[in-house]
């Protein structure tokens, strides 16, 4: 894994510092554990085995690191306002981007991080928004023959993403983020999450570190990551992600897919062998292709890379040097 992150040799010239999970855990110092077992169980996604031990090993050190970054960011903002002889008229939220493949554990990580940060002594207001709501509606994707490209860069309304993040960074109140239903596998028309001047925003999705081609006319093209103060990439060997994806699909076949309102309800009626074959096809033709072409190449752009092992728990950490 690290060979692709570390493009330069010898290793001392790498833009990252590398740590084992045990080494990383030591950076927790005296950061308190503010979550309970039941809370972690409630926050984790289907098939994700994360427990309190994993929170202690990885997340408390991460919480301490982010606290330092947020404090430094706020200090710099105040100093810049003083330098410009400006009164502090609005609050600039600290935005954290969370990226990685489908089935790698982004959602669990983002939810647990949200709870930990909100329980800092300063009690910051923390919001979590996913990019799912910024997908084009299925009707639009069907019209453009893009349903099989859902999740690829062109299936997202990037303009809407940039407008949303720009409004958040500008300190605007009651900014709307469109909502998405995993039951109907579609954007919910007319339904929104209201984001009202958070201290910290966690923005999670497979595409948040992606870049676009620069226009030939030389005009400025903003990237989603331009709005981030810190970014995290959840990583694992693609063979492991493949297994987790298939396992999750088969679990959903026995649970959520059984709901008649589910977009994937038809898969619950198939035999186990037929359903597994469908899942394999979805992985090979859509998700693996998207991972290799669009998601994995963004990994070196992250400030922090969390590498998972076969048990779905984080084994290695890479932190970008400042």
From Swiss-Prot:
It is an enzyme of class 2 (transferase). It catalyses: (R)-pantothenate + ATP = (R)-4'-phosphopantothenate + ADP + H(+). GO terms for molecular function: ATP binding; pantothenate kinase activity. Pathway: Cofactor biosynthesis; coenzyme A biosynthesis; CoA from (R)-pantothenate: step 1/5. ATP binds at residues 100-107. One of its GO terms (cellular component) is cytoplasm. Its EC number is 2.7.1.33. InterPro entries: P-loop_NTPase (IPR027417), PanK (IPR004566), PRK/URK (IPR006083). One of its GO terms (biological process) is coenzyme A biosynthetic process. The lineage of its organism: Bacteria, Pseudomonadati, Pseudomonadota, Alphaproteobacteria, Hyphomicrobiales. The keyword Nucleotide-binding applies. Belongs to the prokaryotic pantothenate kinase family. The keyword Membrane does not apply. It holds the Pfam family PRK. Keywords: ATP-binding, Coenzyme A biosynthesis, Cytoplasm, Kinase, Nucleotide-binding, Transferase. It comes from Brucella canis (strain ATCC 23365 / NCTC 10854 / RM-666). PANTHER family: URIDINE KINASE. Its main location: cytoplasm. It comes from the Bacteria. This is Pantothenate kinase. HAMAP family: Pantothen_kinase_1. It is found in: Cytoplasm.
